[in-house]
Each structure stands twice: as C-alpha cells, then as structure tokens.
C-alpha cells in the first residue's frame, strides 16, 4: 500500500475556520448503566482532535458504537460526551443525528476549535452499505476529511470510504498513521531477526496471517488452542483439546512451508492440561507428546516458555497476535503473561515490539505492561487483514502522500 498523506501535513492555513469531518473509533465498552468501562479508544483519538482544534478547525466527530439495527438508544454516543469533553478540555456539543439540516446548523454554530459529536453513524443502514447518497450527506457537513479510525479501516463503509470521494483533502489521522507505520513497516521492512508469535484458539482465523508472515519472519512461535491441530497433524494424541479436524492437512502444509522457507517454527514442547474448561479445573503439566485422554490443554508449559524466551532474545522485531492460553482463567495465564513480560523487557533493550490487536492487547493490559510496548494496535480485524497483506478500503480512499 502506498504511503498516505497525514493530517500533520495540513497547517493552520489549510485548517483555520474549516469544518473537518473526522472518522474516529469511539466503539468503547459500556456497562449496564452506560458508564465507560475502558476509555482506551477515546484517549487514542485525542491527539488528532487536539491538533485540529489547535489549528482553528471546527471539528465534526463521527463514530459507530456496537452493531445497532436502526436507531437503538442503548447504542447512543451521548454517554461518551462527558469523558470526551474532559480529555479535550472543551464542552463537546452532541448532535441527535449524523446528517441533515439540524446537524448542519450545529456545525455552522461551532466556534473555531469547537467540537461536535455526531450520533451513532450506524443508526443508518446506509452506513454499512456504503451508500453514495448517504456518504454525500455526511460530506456536506465539512470541507476536509480525516480518517483516524484504524479499527474500521478494513470496512468499506460510507464514513470510512465513501465520504473520501466527496472531500479533498482526505488524510490519515495520527493514530491511523502510527498503525500503518508500524504494521506495514514491520511486514515490509522489519529489522531482522524478525519473530512472530501467533496464538488464539483457532488456526482457521489465523491462516492468512501465518501464510503471509512465513514470507518475512525468521522465527514463528505458535501457542494457544490452535497448537492441538498442529499436534494432531503430526500424529500426536491431544485428549479432549480443541482440534479443527478439517484443518489437519493445512497445518501439515504450513509446517512444510516453514521448513522450505527456512523459518524456525516452534511449537510448545509441554502444555498445562485441565480436566475441564473452568477456572477451578484440576491441572497438571505434561509433555506435548503425553496428553492423556479426557484432559485438555489450556496453556503452554514452563519448558516452552523458556524455549520461546531464548528464541525471542535473539530478535530485533516481534509481532504478537493472540494469547498462549486461556489467560482469562488465572490458572492458565502463565504462558501469556510470560510472553508479555518478556516483550516489555525486550522493548526496553531497543527491540521493536508490536502487539497486533485483539486478545493480545487485553492480555498486555491485564499484566499492566501496555505502555512498555513499541506499538499496541487498536484494530482487531483491521490489524489481521493488514498483516495478511490485504489492502484496507479505508486507507486506499485517502490521498497519496
């Protein structure tokens, strides 16, 4: 993907007095009383918004929340206004809609440096259909388009892709820029040796990532539930562990591919097994070759942690996507936590550490090491598709640098 123009190239002359439509990702978790339980995504959007405010723009923020079918009050963005106002240091104005005359009046009434939050853009089915008429109505609110919502960049929706056709310039926000620099940069031009750690429960969701990474990595470490499909493909007995029977041939071919490309593919040599899938299950450590019937593997074992650790010590760039075990249960979190701690330590020694979205982000946050990593991706699906080498519609729509 070509390099895209960044919001940082727009100066006061380009921005003062202009309305700027900013697609942000404010899809934060709310509890039953509409309190924000994790404001990471809101905080991540602040640098771009503050830059635009500081240059005298009228900022129009657009986001989705959840997957509403039509107008659904529980998916309103209103509960986000107090936190957003607090972080930005201005009183954010809330619109009751995302298009139309009323909204246009609110935009016109904003002072320079003022901020308006549109209501959930997915209240309109046209958003996800990328309806050009709807995109035009969104574009009618502004002069400039900034996409800072990396988490939805893999979707061609009206607010992420369609609107860019009607507004020039269309540029990447600072968060989007950082995501692209790290994720595209790591895959296209990593400092070697380059390792990828891929975990998670299913091989099927990570096939594309593994295949793509086999072209660039020197070392590939596999963990999580997917390892049992690889074990079974090698003829090992896996007890009651999770296996994707229809992916056994694929697992074999991935191991052969790694060998042919000279990639060091490491599978755990020991596992922590449990007699049931529960936080209070009985557990024991066994070699990967000796999983008894009726037991299931829920984490990688201490020998594997040591082997993985020694392999990672040799590297200069590491991408991590997916946990090593069922880290939600404390008893089976040791593997994932050990990887998080080691990556934090290596970051301190100058290794580039990239946490590629999804559950690994939650794992790193659980251990309290998020701020120690070089880059934590805010996108789940978008990070995966980028690592798979797929073009992202929300990025392609932006102006070339």
From Swiss-Prot:
Tissue specificity, in the record's words, reads:
Expressed in roots, leaves and inflorescence.
Q: Give the record's keywords alphabetically.
A: ATP-binding, Cytoplasm, Glycolysis, Kinase, Magnesium, Metal-binding, Nucleotide-binding, Transferase
| Binding-site residues, ADP | 200, 224, 327
> What CDD domains does this protein map onto?
Phosphoglycerate_kinase
Q: Which cofactor does it need?
A: Mg(2+)
Q: Which positions does UniProt annotate for CDP binding?
A: 200, 224, 322, 327
Induction context? Repressed by glucose-hexokinase treatment. Induced by heat stress (e.g. 37 degrees Celsius). Accumulates in response to 3-oxo-octanoyl-homoserine lactone treatment (3OC8-HSL), a bacterial quorum-sensing signal. Regulated by light.
The entry marks the following residues as binding ATP, namely: 206, 225, 297, 321, 328, 359-360
Question: Has keyword Transport?
Answer: no
Q: Which residues bind AMP?
A: 202, 206, 225, 297, 328
EC number(s) per entry:
2.7.2.3
**Metabolic or biological pathway:** Carbohydrate degradation; glycolysis; pyruvate from D-glyceraldehyde 3-phosphate: step 2/5
Residues that coordinate or bind (2R)-3-phosphoglycerate: 24-25, 27, 41, 63-64, 66-67, 122, 154-155
Give me any GO biological process, just one.
response to heat
Gene Ontology CC, one term: mitochondrion
- Recorded catalytic activity of this chain's protein: (2R)-3-phosphoglycerate + ATP = (2R)-3-phospho-glyceroyl phosphate + ADP
Q: Which family does it belong to?
A: Belongs to the phosphoglycerate kinase family.
Give the record's subunit note. Monomer.
Provide the protein name.
Answer: Phosphoglycerate kinase 3, cytosolic
Instruction: Identify the species of origin.
Output: Arabidopsis thaliana (Mouse-ear cress)
């Amino acid at each position: 993907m070509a390099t895209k123009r960044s919001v940082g190239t727009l100066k006061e002359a380009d921005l003062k007095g202009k309305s700027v439509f900013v697609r942000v990702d404010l899809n934060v978790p709310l509890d039953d009383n509409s309190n924000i339980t994790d404001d990471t995504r809101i905080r991540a959007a602040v640098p771009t918004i503050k830059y635009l405010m500081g240059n005298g723009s009228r900022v129009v923020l657009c986001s989705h929340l959840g997957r509403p079918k039509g107008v659904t009050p529980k998916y309103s963005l209103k509960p986000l206004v107090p936190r957003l106002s607090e972080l930005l240091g201005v009183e954010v104005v809330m619109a009751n809609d995302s298009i139309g005359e009323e909204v246009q009046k609110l935009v016109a009434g904003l002072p320079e440096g003022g901020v308006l939050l549109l209501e959930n853009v997915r209240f309109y089915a046209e958003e996800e259909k990328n309806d050009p008429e709807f995109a035009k109505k969104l574009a009618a609110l502004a002069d400039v388009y900034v996409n800072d919502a990396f988490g939805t960049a893999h979707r061609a929706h009206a607010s992420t892709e369609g609107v860019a056709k009607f507004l020039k310039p269309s540029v990447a926000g600072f968060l989007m820029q950082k995501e692209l620099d790290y994720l595209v940069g790591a895959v296209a031009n990593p400092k070697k040796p380059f390792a990828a750690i891929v975990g998670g429960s299913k091989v099927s969701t990570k096939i594309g990532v593994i295949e793509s990474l086999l072209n660039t990595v020197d070392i590939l470490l596999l963990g999580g539930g997917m390892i049992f499909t690889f074990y079974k493909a090698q003829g090992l007995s896996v007890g009651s562990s999770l296996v994707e029977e229809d992916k056994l041939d694929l697992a074999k071919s991935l191991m052969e591919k790694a060998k042919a490309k000279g990639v060091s593919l490491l599978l755990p040599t020991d596992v922590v097994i449990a007699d049931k899938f529960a936080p209070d299950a009985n557990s024991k450590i066994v070699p990967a070759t000796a999983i008894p019937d009726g037991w299931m593997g829920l984490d990688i074992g201490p020998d594997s942690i040591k082997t993985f650790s020694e392999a990672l010590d040799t590297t200069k760039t590491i991408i991590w996507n997916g946990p090593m075990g069922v880290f939600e249960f404390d008893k089976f979190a040791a593997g994932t936590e050990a990887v998080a701690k080691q990556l934090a330590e290596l970051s301190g020694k100058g290794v580039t550490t990239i946490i590629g979205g999804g559950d690994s982000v939650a794992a790193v946050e659980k251990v309290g090491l998020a701020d120690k990593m070089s880059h934590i991706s805010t996108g789940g699906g978008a990070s995966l598709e980028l690592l798979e080498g797929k073009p992202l519609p929300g990025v392609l729509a932006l102006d070339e640098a």
